[in-house]
A protein has these predicted regions:
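Conserved serine/cysteine hydrolase catalytic core
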Residues: 84-92
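Primarily recognizes the serine-hydrolase "nucleophile elbow" in alpha/beta-hydrolase
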Residues: 1-65, 75, 79-80, 84, ...
């Protein structure tokens, strides 16, 4: 086994990876996922999600290329099912989510739709929208910037500290590991 403590799972993802993490959050208790993984649903249930400018919707504001890559020939058949704002239930885990106002690749509407769906189901969510910042940034500082400086977005830099505080507050078992700057 992987020695994973089933009650201590936090999933995270950026952009299309955010869609993957959020998919686990909304589909963890489905028979379909249990069949795919061969595991009991409770063993794969995330306790929380950290979603970083995630692809969420195949709707008007969706990132169609991501959905076409994900669904291939079954795009028309599955695009609504994989629009995660429609899949949130009372069993979806609490969520930390952030985005940037300037993101022109995955539009802000994606997180707005997901946060609204979480709110309507009574799922606790911490949501941050930073005024500046391109798509595809990591820690938004020199640690994750590429060699020509792309990836530095000072307005977004607080996201990792905010996420750490959220983890410590929401999950008492969290070890409080800090990312060195």
């Amino acid at each position: 086994g992987l020695n994973i403590e089933k009650n201590k799972i936090i999933v995270s993802g950026f952009s299309a990876g955010g869609h993957l993490a959020a998919s686990l959050g909304v589909f963890w208790n489905t028979e379909e996922l249990a069949g795919i993984t061969g595991m009991e649903n409770e063993r794969i249930r995330p306790n929380g999600m950290i979603l970083n400018y995630p692809v969420i919707t195949s709707g008007v504001a969706g990132h169609e290329e991501s959905f076409r890559n994900l669904l291939g020939d079954r795009y028309e058949e599955l695009k609504d099912r994989m629009s995660l704002e429609f899949q949130v239930t009372e069993d979806t885990p609490r969520t930390f989510i952030w985005h940037t106002f300037e993101d022109q690749t995955v539009l802000l509407d994606n997180t707005l739709l997901f946060v609204q769906a979480l709110y309507k189901k009574g799922i606790p969510v911490e949501y941050h929208v930073f005024p500046q910042g391109p798509h595809g940034i990591g820690l938004a500082n020199e640690l994750t910037a590429n060699e020509n400086g792309r990836g530095i977005a000072r307005a977004c830099e607080p996201w990792s500290e905010l996420a750490g505080k959220w983890l410590n507050r929401e999950f008492p078992w969290w070890n409080g590991a800090k990312i060195e700057r």
